[in-house]
Amino acid sequence: LNLPGNNMSSRVDLKMVKDSAFQLSVQPFLGIEVFRAEISVDSVKVIDRMNKRYVADNYANLKGQTPIEFNFYNLQALFTNRLFLPGQQGISPKLYNRFKLKQDGPAAEIQVKDVMGLLYTFMADGEEKILSTCISEPSDRYALQWDYADFRLADGQPFPMRMDVQVMKDGASQGGVTLHFSRMQTDVPVKMDFSIPAKYKRITLSQIIKSLSSNKM
């Protein structure tokens, strides 16, 4: 995790159930969890165990709290290195004409805009791997840059074992996170638990983000 004046490295466990939910567990000290987040099709839940507080809200209430908006399926596609169409669960052949394609030899640039005017730019190589995804707002001042590297075969398909995610403002990084996957398992039973202790205080997602930006770890 890289924020202005605040850097932290940690073990993170990521669990995902396709088209349902995924869960992140941050364990920086000897496997002791300090932070957990679960994102489902319609809601976001976060537990901050160090400060005994939590977030539980649906996407409708979160609108306006984050500079970039996309649905669960779009976020799932970012984590699984897939092309996606803003606001859609999948891409059917009848939607192909919404994309603009530019090719330069084996490389390709694929672009699409959503109803808010956000521009989604996907860069792909000759093997049809997504190398990066950039989501920028109309003025091009703010953007989310998601880069993929260190591709290895998983179930016969290339998967990026490194993901670098940066929030950009005027072309400069304002903070981000780099994910290094040590291993990946697919098609295995997944148990997701998100019990919230009764004494924890409920707060908003914006309060969590503000805290991460202002406190040193």
Briefly describe each language-model feature range.
Residues 91-201:
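Gly/Pro-enriched, hydrophobic low-complexity segments
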Residues 200-217:
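Short, low-complexity, Pro/Ser/Thr/Gly-rich segments in the mature regions of secreted, periplasmic
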Residues 13-14, 34-36, 119-121, 150:
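Short, surface-exposed charged micro-motifs
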Residues 7-15, 20:
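Beta-strand-dominated lipid-handling architectures at cellular/organellar boundaries
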Residues 8-10, 35-39, 141-145:
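Amphipathic hydrophobic-ligand
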Residues 1-4:
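A short, Trp-centered hydrophobic/proline-enriched beta-strand micro-motif
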Residues 21-77:
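An acidic-aromatic
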